[in-house]
């Protein structure tokens, strides 16, 4: 009968500590790019939906990651990652 491999890897940081550190980093980055009132509203929505649970922490992490990714992708003034508008060969831009 097969056995699961032994966990011989390096000791990992507990998930909840890692998640809280990640959330703190995302919040610090988000306040640089979005109005605080929006972020407060997002936090209220998550709290009303999930309460004070790890599921809520995971949800807000996922949403903040998506918001920041899209924000950078469409052209954040603070970032060099954004899309640069490209012109077509005939000189018109896409609409």
From Swiss-Prot:
Q: Where is this region: Homooligomerization?
A: 1-42
One family from Pfam that matches here is: VPR
As for PTM, the annotation reads: Phosphorylated on several residues by host. These phosphorylations regulate VPR activity for the nuclear import of the HIV-1 pre-integration complex.
- Subcellular locations according to the entry: Virion; Host nucleus; Host extracellular space
InterPro entries (UniProt xref): RetroV_VpR/X
Quote the subunit structure annotation: Homooligomer, may form homodimer. Interacts with p6-gag region of the Pr55 Gag precursor protein through a (Leu-X-X)4 motif near the C-terminus of the P6gag protein. Interacts with host UNG. May interact with host RAD23A/HHR23A. Interacts with host VPRBP/DCAF1, leading to hijack the CUL4A-RBX1-DDB1-DCAF1/VPRBP complex, mediating ubiquitination of host proteins such as TERT and ZGPAT and arrest of the cell cycle in G2 phase.
Regarding protein family, the annotation reads: Belongs to the HIV-1 VPR protein family.
Name the chain's protein: Protein Vpr
